[in-house]
């Protein structure tokens, strides 16, 4: 049997842009994404602390430092300046669960890394 477990999290990131006319996804600063073990195309769940919205999308790696941009239809669920939690999950069996520790990255209001 497998269980969906927290794989990684970027905690309290700030939305820097929302692009309704893009195809979809969330663009995340590449360095930040890699530190959080997020990969291009990986499914993530976004939780907006300001308005309570919760939605799923996939990761695109961004070039701008500190960039967190929600794209496509999901751009209607956030506002620039909103604080979000970006979560990724992985399917794990009992042995993997026992050995796993989620990667948690804390950031400040400019999406600069505070702690990993």
From Swiss-Prot:
Is synthesized initially as an inactive proenzyme, which is activated by self-cleavage at a specific serine bond to produce a beta-subunit with a hydroxyl group at its C-terminus and an alpha-subunit with a pyruvoyl group at its N-terminus. Binds 1 pyruvoyl group covalently per subunit. Its EC number is 4.1.1.11. Keywords: Autocatalytic cleavage, Cytoplasm, Decarboxylase, Lyase, Pantothenate biosynthesis, Pyruvate, Schiff base, Zymogen. The modification Pyruvic acid (Ser) is found at residue 25. GO terms for biological process: alanine biosynthetic process; pantothenate biosynthetic process. The keyword Transmembrane helix does not apply. Heterooctamer of four alpha and four beta subunits. HAMAP family: PanD. Belongs to the PanD family. This is Aspartate 1-decarboxylase.
């Amino acid at each position: 049997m497998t269980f969906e477990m927290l794989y990684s999290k970027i905690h309290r990131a700030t939305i820097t842009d929302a692009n309704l006319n893009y195809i979809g996804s969330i663009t995340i600063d590449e360095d930040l994404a890699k530190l959080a073990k997020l990969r291009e195309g990986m499914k993530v769940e976004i939780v907006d602390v300001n308005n309570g919205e919760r939605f799923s999308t996939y990761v695109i790696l961004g070039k701008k430092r500190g960039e967190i941009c929600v794209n496509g239809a999901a751009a209607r669920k956030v506002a620039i300046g909103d604080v979000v939690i970006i979560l990724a999950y992985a399917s794990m069996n009992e042995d993997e669960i026992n050995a796993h520790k989620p990667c948690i990255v804390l950031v400040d209001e400019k999406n600069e890394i505070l702690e990993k």
